[in-house]
Amino acid sequence: MAELACFCYPHLENDSYRFIPFNSLAIKCMLTAKVDKKDQDKFYNSIIYGIAPPPQFKKRYNTNDNSRGMNYETPMFNKVAVLICEALNSIKVTQSDVANVLSKVVSVRHLENLVLRRENHQDVLFHSKELLLKSVLIAIGHSKEIETTATAEGGEIVFQNAAFTMWKLTYLEHRLMPILDQNFIEYKITVNEDKPISESHVKELIAELRWQYNKFAVITHGKGHYRVVKYSSVANHADRVYATFKSNNKNGNVLEFNLLDQRVIWQNWYAFTSSMKQGNTLEICKKLLFQKMKRESNPFKGLSTDRKMDEVSQIGI
């Protein structure tokens, strides 16, 4: 995760702003600079290489002292920064909006995936600039539309029906902020269209999840799509979701946290996110992840007979 101010800076032209991507040498200069505390939140002028991000975001970049940040010296950083600028420059951002826009925390890996989709000649985003920019504006939280299958970050499709598409995420192969744990495996489910979904299509999805992905929890980050994650990583997701939710509220980026279909979501996660929305502390919310929940009656009678027991998946073992 990183703020948009880590990728670009605003340049005032007439009554609105044009956004310009940072170059890696300017960032490198900022990372070595001694800056007064009062100037930590201001864009840094490297003198030689142009404007750099505010020093308060130093931890967002990979350095000798911090291996968890972005690999900003890779070509992928520039591609992501350029893509963000293209999207922001396609809309009008005024002086009253600019601070709010740049403070938004975005998924670095999501944006890298959109770059990969853009470069894939077989992908619809390669052929449609309008759909590409729409996908980016959704990814950076500027659009109120949810991420659907056409505007999704992408990955490898492992399941699809008339209503849903399930993607295996490819973060292990990333350049900008790769997942280093070689045991990482995670999926994302997007709706094909943002409209009411028939019970039969929900039932098909639940059957697929129950039998092929029974070692995983189905959760949501509140953005209109599902994530299918290992139970061992749920607490980590909870920390990130809670931190982003609080940060957005603090900065005035109040977005509706979409709890999605309770029949699909893991019971404990639904309880966690509901508690978070009520304003409870992280400690109180996380207790619900490890609490034994009363099993609800099956909303789809006969679902367990849809597949034979010898078809139960070994994925995740």
From Swiss-Prot:
Q: Name one GO cellular component term.
A: host cell cytoplasm
Q: Which SUPFAM superfamilies match?
A: Rotavirus NSP2 fragment, C-terminal domain, Rotavirus NSP2 fragment, N-terminal domain
Q: What biological process terms from GO does the record include?
A: viral genome replication
Cofactor dependence is on: Mg(2+)
User: Which InterPro entries did the record assign?
Assistant: Rota_NS35_C, Rota_NS35_N, Rotavirus_NSP2, Rotavirus_NSP2_C, Rotavirus_NSP2_N
Enzyme Commission number, as recorded = 3.6.4.-
Question: Which residues are in coiled coils?
Answer: none
Q: Where is this region: RNA-binding?
A: 205-241
Positions contributing to ATP binding: 107-109, 188, 221-223, 227
Q: Name one GO molecular function term.
A: ATP binding
Recorded hits in Pfam families, A to Z, give: Rota_NS35_C, Rota_NS35_N
Group of enzyme by EC: hydrolase
Which UniProt keywords are given for this protein, alphabetically ordered? Answer: ATP-binding, Host cytoplasm, Host-virus interaction, Hydrolase, Magnesium, Metal-binding, Nucleotide-binding, RNA-binding
Q: Subcellular location, in the record's words?
A: Host cytoplasm
**Domain of life from the UniProt record:** Viruses
Subunit structure as annotated in this protein's UniProt entry: Homooctamer. Interacts with VP1; this interaction is weak. Interacts with NSP5; this interaction leads to up-regulation of NSP5 phosphorylation and formation of viral factories. Interacts with host DCP1A, DCP1B, DDX6, EDC4 and EIF2S1; these interactions are probably part of the sequestration of some host SGs and PBs proteins in viral factories.
HAMAP family assigned to the protein according to its UniProt record, in alphabetical order: ROTA_NSP2 (MF_04089)
Q: Which family does it belong to?
A: Belongs to the rotavirus NSP2 family.
Q: State what this protein does.
A: Participates in replication and packaging of the viral genome. Plays a crucial role, together with NSP5, in the formation of virus factories (viroplasms), which are large inclusions in the host cytoplasm where replication intermediates are assembled and viral RNA replication takes place. Displays ssRNA binding, NTPase, RNA triphosphatase (RTPase) and ATP-independent helix-unwinding activities. The unwinding activity may prepare and organize plus-strand RNAs for packaging and replication by removing interfering secondary structures.
Q: Which protein are we looking at?
A: Non-structural protein 2
